[in-house]
């Protein structure tokens, strides 16, 4: 059963803006592995939280709650966004956060996406134009998968990505 974030973590201290955002989220699940050194916290919210703030939240939870233990803290966020959001509007607002996350995942894919041209030909149809290199051609499908995972699974919006190279 979902609980409000600060009902699950009542002693956690975070900065003012983050406190407001987290007060509007719910924790839907907390899971730990058998070795008890990895914890996953599943958040559900209606307002976007930048990935750098999620990383800071993971650090705060680790430092304040698990300070004397080796614990890998992972926050997995999911959003129920209002009808005003389209994939195009989401990309305008959330692109920096997407790039931040991709940078932590793969520097090569981050650089490819950062330098790519993104053009929406419809609310949920993205033409992604990458530099015509062997690296871009071999890694482009990972970028598409990543974008679809963030936009479709995390944010609940439709996105169709068409690749082009120039």
Name what the model sees in each region:
Residues 1-166:
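Intrinsically disordered, low-complexity basic tails and flexible linkers associated
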């Amino acid at each position: 059963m979902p609980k409000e974030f600060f009902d699950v973590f009542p002693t956690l201290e975070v900065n003012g803006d983050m406190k407001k955002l987290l007060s509007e989220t719910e924790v839907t699940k907390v899971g730990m592995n058998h070795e008890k050194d990895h914890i996953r916290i599943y958040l559900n919210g209606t307002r976007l939280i930048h990935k750098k703030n999620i990383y800071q939240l993971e650090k705060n939870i680790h430092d304040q709650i698990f300070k004397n233990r080796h614990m890998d803290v992972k926050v997995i966020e999911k959003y129920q966004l209002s009808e005003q959001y389209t994939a195009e509007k989401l990309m305008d607002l959330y692109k920096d956060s997407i790039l931040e996350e991709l940078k932590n995942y793969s520097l090569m894919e981050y650089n490819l996406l950062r330098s790519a041209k993104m053009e929406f030909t419809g609310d949920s149809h993205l033409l992604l134009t990458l530099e015509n290199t062997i690296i871009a051609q071999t890694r482009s499908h990972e970028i598409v998968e990543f974008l679809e995972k963030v936009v479709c699974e995390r944010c609940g919006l439709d996105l169709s990505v068409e690749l082009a190279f120039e």
